[in-house]
A protein has these predicted regions:
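Hydrophobic alpha-helical segments with transmembrane-like composition
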Residues: 85-97, 103-112
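Aromatic-lined substrate-binding rim segments of carbohydrate-active enzymes
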Residues: 28-81, 85, 117-129
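A mature extracytoplasmic/lumenal domain signature
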Residues: 70-72, 110, 301
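Low-complexity, intrinsically disordered regulatory segments enriched in Pro/Ser/Thr and acidic residues
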Residues: 81, 88, 103, 356-359
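Extracellular/luminal regions of secreted and cell-surface proteins that mediate adhesion/ECM remodeling
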Residues: 211-359
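Short amphipathic alpha-helices and their capping/turn segments at secondary-structure boundaries
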Residues: 24-28, 54-64, 91-98, 286-287
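Catalytic-core regions of glycoside hydrolase
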Residues: 2-25, 102-206
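Conserved, mostly hydrophobic/aromatic
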Residues: 35, 63, 93, 106, ...
Length: 359
């Protein structure tokens, strides 16, 4: 460390953790390749008002990153107003599985492209990502102002037409709020499709195209020593080297462990704004009264259902928590770290006021 290294200007002794990044992320949960789960209206409602919706649940459990398609094949009992009947079926399915957390999205498939059918999807799948066909101009105009994702059916013949559809309908930023799902109709993912998939920030494809997010921790900075009932300042630096964001809500947690004693802390990280590239989160945690000694510091990213987000780092993981290092807890009369960031910038250690003019 050189004479003028920024570490020399730290206000307290810190430890910097830099996990080794893995060469590739092989975690395909909520990422990468998807599978269609196609459900037949005729089979799931063979008699009016009699449903076999448990079949959907079985199919979802068997699929990896399922994308739901409600196939509008008309049952024999339907005599009049088939689109209205299908809309009622959509609402029934939505009420049954809207809270299902495993779905990548639900394709908006209809009989007549009617507003009643579209509204059935919008109203019934409130917590799911609705996927509109990129080339269904009328539907996309109707969804304008609402949150929706895209299903892009493309190949090496029509990839330019897909690019034109993105441009004409101003869909370049859809990926920031909802997934762009790629359906490659060729046998494999050709060079044009692969290149454009990166431009469209596609999160999933029906073939292995290396899409989705790839989240890692670049650095975690924490103090060597903290006070019982004091403050723990933490500085996280994450990076998403993938091409899409993470569409399910998740939160950042920290845990301190000493023997059988464990303390968990939820952090206030704005993870909904984490897209691609680098992002930092700085936070000072208020610690409870703790026994003095050395604690293992771990961190985790949990989805709302408490499943953990797998990071692309070479670090020991247990129960979703990645081990980062150790922190020494002492009993002190004052908390020296309570207002530690009030007088200097923690990422650069620069003073928050202009230096005085030399005499």
């Amino acid at each position: 460390m050189g004479r003028y290294s920024l570490e020399n200007y730290e206000k307290y002794k810190t430890i910097k953790i830099r996990p080794h990044p893995l060469p590739s992320n092989e975690n395909h949960q909520k990422n990468g390749q998807f599978q269609y789960v196609t459900c037949s209206w005729k089979e799931l409602e063979p008699t009016r008002g009699v449903y076999r919706l448990q079949e959907i649940e079985k199919a979802l459990l068997a699929a990896s990153n399922p994308v739901l398609v409600l196939q509008p094949d008309i049952p024999l009992w339907v005599k009049d107003h088939p689109s209205d009947c299908f809309a009622a079926f959509i609402r029934k399915v939505g009420s049954y599985i809207d809270s299902e957390g495993r779905l990548v999205g639900v394709v908006i498939s209809t009989l007549a492209d009617s507003k009643e059918e579209w509204n059935a999807y919008i109203d019934s799948f409130e917590h799911q990502n609705l996927l509109a066909d990129l080339h269904n101009d009328i539907l996309i105009r109707y969804l304008n102002g609402r949150r929706f994702g895209l299903l892009v059916k493309c190949n090496e013949e029509n990839w330019m037409r897909c690019c034109e559809a993105f441009a004409k309908q101003n869909l370049q930023h859809v990926w920031k709020g909802s997934p762009v799902v790629l359906h490659v109709t060729d046998d494999g993912c050709g060079p044009h499709i692969r290149r454009e998939a990166y431009r469209w920030h596609a999160s999933h494809a029906n073939s292995n195209a290396g899409l989705g997010y790839n989240l890692a921790l670049r650095r975690l900075t924490h103090p060597e020593t903290v006070s019982s009932n004091g403050s723990l300042p933490l500085r996280f630096w994450f990076v998403n080297t993938g091409i899409s964001t993470i569409y399910d809500d998740f939160s950042l947690w920290v845990k301190l462990v000493k023997g059988n004693i464990a303390h968990e802390f939820p952090l206030q990280a704005a993870t909904d704004s984490w897209l691609t590239g680098d992002f930092v989160h700085n936070e000072i945690i208020q610690l409870p009264v703790m026994q003095p000694g050395e604690y293992t510091l771990s961190f985790a990213l949990f989805f709302n259902n408490r499943t953990h987000l797998q990071l692309n780092i070479g670090a020991k993981e247990q129960g979703g928590y990645y081990e980062a290092g150790t922190v020494k807890v002492e009993v002190t009369s004052v908390d020296p770290l309570l207002n530690i960031w009030d007088s200097y910038y923690p990422e650069g250690y620069y003073p928050l006021e202009d230096p005085k003019v030399p005499e």
